Structures are given as structure tokens and as C-alpha cells.
Amino acid sequence: MKIGTQNQAFFPQNILEKFCYIKEMGFDGFEIDGKLLVNHLDEVKAAIKETGLPVTTACGGYDGWIGDFIEERRLNGLKQIERILEALAEVGGQGIIVPAAWGMFTFRLPPMVSPRSLEGDRKVVSDSLRYLDKVAERTGTTVYLEPLNRYQDHMINTLADARRYIVENDLKQVKIIGDFYHMNIEEDDMAKALHDNRDLLGHVHIADNHRYQPGTGTLNFRRLFDQLRDDRYQGYVVYEGRVRAENLPEAYRQSLAWLRTC
């Protein structure tokens, strides 16, 4: 299994040192912040060349969601995502992770009434995805549509929700990213959800049930990894979560070593 990581606060700030550190820890790739990639493109290219550590994907680094309630923010976000995809193409990255929105609204907390209809949600998100599908085709990249749990987003919560957008809009460059943390909240059976969407599953985020490092909670990673292997999943699985320990770097190394046994 190819395992990557996002940034952690205890990683070096210098870009080359960061890449060296991630590789030395034993990771196979780096999921970079989109803004860091765009603003320091030459440094990132040099770090990739020096270390041989690939940038797998980008996550974050733009302002405005593809399902944003504010149209100006949505359009601005699309342009920023476009630039990130262009930069990813320059460094050999696969694509960008994109949720409908994060923290914008939830039916689970007051006021519990959305300022936009469900039909309006579908139109806006679909319009955004069709636009990005063309950008991804032009740049040879992929948009990974991420379902979030019900407390962080109200539009796309399950892998089936993401699948519906892809199928109904006939999107060619959009795939699903399955995030174990969110899936543990939303899916009836995580392994079955992975299997049912194996044809569109392009990327995976991992954290344990409490959002901390794998191996410290209750998720059955062996079962989930076995499912991915049975389905011949070829993508990366990427650490996205916090680390809880007295010695953060050592705990991160231990988690990765443990995960390699799953």
C-alpha cells in the first residue's frame, strides 16, 4: 500500500527539509497544501528532484467552496483550484481533494435551516464540478470529491452521495476520495462502501475513529486495507489527522510502522 502524509506542525518549515523529513520517516508521498505549492512552486520542484519524494495530491489552499453560499467566493475558489491543478501538473501530482464545503453549514446545529434549497445545492455543486472536470482534463489531473460527515457539511456525506454527482454529471476527471474518519460516522459498513464504489475510488484519507493517528483508536484498518487490496486499489492512502502523544514524531513513526503490518 502506498502511504503518504499531509503536513504536521512538528515537520520542518523549510520546504526541502520538510521533504527530507517526510521521506526519512518512511512515507511514500506528500499531500501538499495547495497554496504552499502555488506560492513556492520552484522550491517544491527542487525538493522533489533532490529527495525523489513525490507530491501525490493537494488538499486545501484555496478560498471559497465549490458549494459556497456566496457566489463570488465560489467563483474565486474555482479559479484558485484551477491554478493549483495547473501547478500539480507541473510537479507530476495526481489531483486535488475537494469537498462541497467545510464548516459552512450543518442541519445538525442551529439554525438548522439552510439559506439555499437542496435543489440549489445540487445545481451549484454540479456547475462547479463540471467546470473543474474540464480543467482537470486540460491539465491531466483529477478532482477527488470528498464526502464529509454531517457535522461539517450538509451536501455530500457518503461515498454514494459523491458517486451520484459524478454519474449524473457524466464527469470523466472526478473520482471519489474515501476518508476513514468521515466514513466511520456516515457509512453503515465502511468496507462495503469502499467495495461498492471501487470503480470510482481514486484516493483515501486515513485517521483513526477519534481523528488521531492510526493504531490508537478503534477502527479495523486491517479489514479496510484487505478490502482495498481485494478491490485492487492502486491509489495512495494519506494520513490526515492529529497526533496525540508526548513524543509526536516518535508516535507518528510508530503509527506508520504499525500500519505497514495491516
Where are these regions (language model features)?
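Histidine-acidic metal/acid-base catalytic patches
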Residues: M1-G26, V38, G92-Q94, R130, ...
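N-terminal small/glycine-rich loop or linker at the start of catalytic domains
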Residues: M1-Q6, T56-G67, W102-V113
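N-terminal substrate-binding region of glycoside hydrolase catalytic domains
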Residues: Y21-N39, C59-D63
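Conserved beta-strand positions in the central sheet of alpha/beta enzyme cores
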Residues: E31, T57, I97, Y144, ...
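Glycine-rich, proline-tolerant flexible connector loops at the mouths of alpha/beta enzymes
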Residues: E31-E50, A100-F107
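Short acidic, glycine/proline-enriched helix-loop-strand junctions
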Residues: H40-A58, P115-S117, T141
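A short acidic, helix-capping loop that chelates divalent metal ions and anchors anionic groups
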Residues: D63-F69, F105-L109, Y151-Q152, I185-E186, ...
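Active-site acidic/histidine proton-transfer and metal-coordination neighborhood
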Residues: R73-K175
